[in-house]
């Protein structure tokens, strides 16, 4: 079915949905729209991932971070000057609402621990985008132990200024993937 969008006019939800179905094919679009993804850590990696998920049409995204936007974040994270001092969860939600207002966004302004991650029960995919190696390990071990039905995508060695050509994705085991350069340790970006 052909859908024409009037130039200069914001398309309706139905019009935008038809455009996305045509772009992805109905089967892929329906899978994306039904997806529920939690992004834990909304810094340089997590903020970019969340925005990409919203652009492709993932149906529900849970944004999780405890931090606020600082001036030092602006060179590598998806925030603007107007967001300085805001919770990263609220700032990123406002950005995603402008990109794709039809994505359901939930926010959790928390420091994630193994005691407070029951909310992950409601999602299909967990994306770990933390800076701290200890927090990465704790989250991954807890998810792998307590949420065996979830896909877990973790990061390793993604901070700093290194050769992006060496970044790869490895399947560690069923439903567990790590993306990174596998050479540099985790650290703040």
Question: Language-model segments: which ranges?
Answer:
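E1/E1-like adenylate-forming module used to activate ubiquitin-like modifiers
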Residues: 1, 5-6, 125-189
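N-terminal charged helix/coil linker that caps or initiates catalytic domains
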Residues: 1-37
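Hydrophobic Val/Ile/Leu positions in short beta-strands of Rossmann-like dinucleotide-binding domains
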Residues: 39-42, 63
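Hydrophobic/small residue at the entry helix of a nucleotide-binding pocket
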Residues: 45
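Conserved S-adenosyl-L-methionine
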Residues: 55-60
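Glycine-rich phosphate-binding loop and adjoining beta1-alpha1-beta2 segment
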Residues: 65-99
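A structured beta-alpha segment of the ubiquitous adenosine-cofactor-binding alpha/beta core
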Residues: 89-95, 99-123, 130-133
């Amino acid at each position: 079915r052909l859908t024409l969008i009037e130039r200069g006019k914001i398309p309706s939800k139905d019009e935008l949905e038809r455009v996305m179905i045509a772009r992805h094919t109905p089967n892929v679009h329906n899978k994306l729209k039904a997806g529920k993804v939690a992004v834990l850590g909304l810094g340089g990696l997590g903020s970019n991932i969340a925005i990409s998920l919203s652009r492709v049409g993932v149906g529900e995204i849970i944004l999780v971070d405890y931090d606020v936007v600082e001036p030092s974040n602006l060179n590598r994270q998806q925030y603007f000057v107007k967001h300085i001092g805001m919770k990263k969860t609220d700032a990123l939600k406002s950005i995603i609402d402008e990109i794709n207002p039809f994505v359901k966004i939930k926010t959790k302004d928390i420091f994630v621990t193994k005691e407070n991650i029951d909310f992950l029960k409601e999602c299909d995919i967990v994306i770990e985008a933390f800076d701290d190696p200890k927090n990465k390990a704790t989250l991954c071990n807890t998810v792998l132990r307590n949420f065996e039905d979830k896909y877990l995508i973790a990061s390793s060695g993604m901070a700093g200024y290194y050769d992006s050509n060496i970044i790869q994705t490895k399947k560690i085991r069923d439903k567990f993937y790590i993306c990174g350069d596998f050479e540099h340790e985790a650290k703040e970006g």
